[in-house]
A protein has these predicted regions:
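Positively charged n-region of N-terminal signal peptides that target proteins for export
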Residues: 1-6
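Bacterial N-terminal signal peptides
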Residues: 9-19
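Short sequence/structural segments immediately N-terminal
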Residues: 21-417
């Protein structure tokens, strides 16, 4: 009886796999002519070796050039059917919230559609975030229904390679440039140089050389998060009174606190997007994880000391940033700058970015999003040149320009009176 049952199972499985193979072959035969590199990529992938057919991810409704719209575009939930643990980790981390964080920016709706939903600007990287079914439907209506899978931001289609996603270059497309040049910092730091020399075989294969993933995805954990978050602000406030005052000023300029220091509705958005650690316990958890990672090559005391230098550079950068913000806020208070219609408060709003309404606020935004970022990111990424010349030095120059421009604006206002 057991022998008969076993034979039935084998027969059913054989029929199923044969049907799966036949179904895939139909797709392959057509797409070899229309999109041949998709086919060759899939054939190189582990998917093709493990009977993960085209229909497994795209469904079987699309079967000709006349009904292309019926091809389903995979989402993380589809990937979770086989990779449940990794998708669950991803959903708990910051990457899953990237799309929501982009949409939450106060002037996101003012940007060209091609840059946002069209994924040629902000959306091109923030597409890694989770999207609702209604958002995906709307994207399709706008002709931008591709690239919603999230996982393929790192495991690019149609090879979906784990080895590719383990390389630091997998992070390079998004973690570079104006406000987050982590690639430039990492690749020219000793950490990055050692790994790149390891890649080109100058250094032996077993050389210790960390990648982005070594530090930020320990043991392959997809729940990516950092202690200081993207903007290097957190709660609770520090014991140091000056630093606490400076951080409050920055939180006010982010409109997370109002000019009186009271929480605003934007704080709820910050909480939902998990862009900052809001308890000491949450911050310490991430710090301890990082120290453990560093401890693979360095003593724990050395690692803690180096990370504390990063904390101290945030403190120093906040001193300059807060002074610049207060200078501009004073112009609002004294009526030199009139509140823009789109503004909630009579106070600068750093999250309006390049849509800031005055020249001095444009300088303030660049000081915050470019120069302050490079000051602390350069320190944490072990890149002295970025921390100093691209960060701290530029902050000093920006502060001087802002203070001088504020004096000019006040003088012009006096003359008009």
């Amino acid at each position: 009886m057991k022998k008969v049952s076993y034979q039935i199972v084998i027969t059913v499985l054989t029929i199923f796999l044969s049907a799966l193979t036949a179904s895939s072959q139909v797709c392959v035969d057509c797409h070899k002519n229309n999109t041949p590199n998709i086919v060759s990529d899939w054939q190189l992938s582990k998917h093709s070796k493990n009977e993960v057919a085209c229909s497994t991810c795209h469904g079987d409704e699309h079967n000709s050039s006349t009904n292309v719209e019926l091809a389903k575009i995979p989402t993380p939930d589809k990937c979770s059917e086989c990779h449940d643990d990794k998708v669950e980790q991803y959903k708990k981390g910051k990457h899953a919230l990237a799309w929501a964080a982009m949409k939450a920016m106060p002037t996101a709706h003012m940007q060209p559609m091609a840059l946002m939903e069209g994924m040629k600007g902000c959306g091109g990287c923030h597409k890694i975030g989770m999207k609702t079914e209604s958002e995906i439907k709307e994207l399709k209506k706008q002709g931008a229904g591709f690239g919603v899978a999230s996982c393929d931001a790192c495991h690019t289609r149609h090879t979906f390679s784990v080895q590719e996603a383990k390389q630091p270059q997998a992070c390079q497309t998004c973690h570079m440039g104006f406000d987050h040049p982590q690639w430039e910092m990492y690749s020219s730091s000793k950490h990055g140089v050692r790994y790149l020399l390891k890649q080109n075989k100058t250094l032996p294969e077993n050389t210790a050389a960390p990648t982005c993933q070594t530090c930020h995805m320990q043991e392959g954990n997809h729940e990516v998060r950092t202690a200081w978050g993207f903007l290097a602000v957190r709660l609770p406030l520090p014991d140091d009174k000056q630093w606490a005052d400076d951080r409050v000023t920055i939180l006010q300029a982010l409109n997370v606190l109002d000019p009186d220091g009271k929480p605003t509705p934007r704080l709820d958005i910050v909480k939902a997007a998990d862009v900052a650690r809001l308890t000491q316990e949450d911050w310490q958890k991430e710090r301890d994880k990082m120290v453990k990672t560093c401890n693979q090559c360095h003593s724990a005391n050395f690692a803690k000391g180096e990370l504390e230098k990063g904390d101290n550079m945030i403190k120093e950068a906040d001193r300059l940033m807060a002074e610049a913000i207060r200078t501009v806020a004073g112009l609002y208070k004294d009526g030199v700058i009139k509140k823009a219609k789109s503004y909630t408060y009579n106070f600068p709003d750093l999250l309006t970015f390049h849509d800031a309404p005055t020249e001095i606020e444009q300088k303030l935004f660049v000081m915050f999003l470019e120069h302050r970022m490079r000051t602390f990111q350069g320190t944490f990424h072990a890149n002295p040149d970025y921390a100093l010349w691209y960060g701290w030095s530029e902050m000093q120059r920006s502060l001087t320009e802002i203070k001088n421009l504020a004096v000019e604006m006040r003088e012009k206002t006096k003359k008009r009176k």
